[in-house]
């Protein structure tokens, strides 16, 4: 934890008190895992506080430009402030927009930590409801936007609940986007996976399968999780 209610990482700070969805393990995993090395244009859909965009800015080449699209006005303003205070303020642009109407030059990499609660669940905070209900951005809207905005040789990287992975892969196939990498995320050794990190690319591909265990059986962070996140966490 850092100043105020935000998080201080090794190279940047994220305030998230005006964002419906807070900094969490899903976003940190995606920001550390997504394949950004060869990307020159990156899009973060539903950026929230800007966490993933800033993590990718830290990991990417100096000539990589990152656009972070966020629908909620308060979150977009806070993401803009977080980006402005970061070392990569010239490379990260926050755009307040619905992704369904957003237009831009195609991207080499599109990332998203999308909403995943189904309609019918209630939240006291309307902004949290908007951020997490699939009524705000459903899987087909998300993947249609990826199809429209992705460069021919680009990739999409997502983190989703395991229960949603089959739906995502079924819909993505309608847009000729298929799994390149399927990585199960296991919270603790011996447990079932509850999240999946997905990479999608154009055309049928050989899919690399693997897993990331966050905590070993004794409760300590696994070597793989430390390898992924140590460039970011202060005490790792």
Curated annotation (Swiss-Prot):
Which PROSITE patterns does the protein's record reference?
N6_MTASE (PS00092)
The Gene Ontology CC terms held by the record are: cytoplasm
As recorded in UniProt, its EC number(s) are 2.1.1.223
GO BP annotation list: methylation; tRNA processing
Q: Can you say where in the cell this protein is located? A: Cytoplasm
Pfam families hit by this protein: MTS
Q: Does the keyword tRNA processing apply?
A: yes
Family assignment from sequence similarity = Belongs to the methyltransferase superfamily. tRNA (adenine-N(6)-)-methyltransferase family.
Question: What is the protein's given name?
Answer: tRNA1(Val) (adenine(37)-N6)-methyltransferase
- Its source organism is Aeromonas hydrophila subsp. hydrophila (strain ATCC 7966 / DSM 30187 / BCRC 13018 / CCUG 14551 / JCM 1027 / KCTC 2358 / NCIMB 9240 / NCTC 8049)
Please name the taxonomic classification of the source: Bacteria, Pseudomonadati, Pseudomonadota, Gammaproteobacteria, Aeromonadales
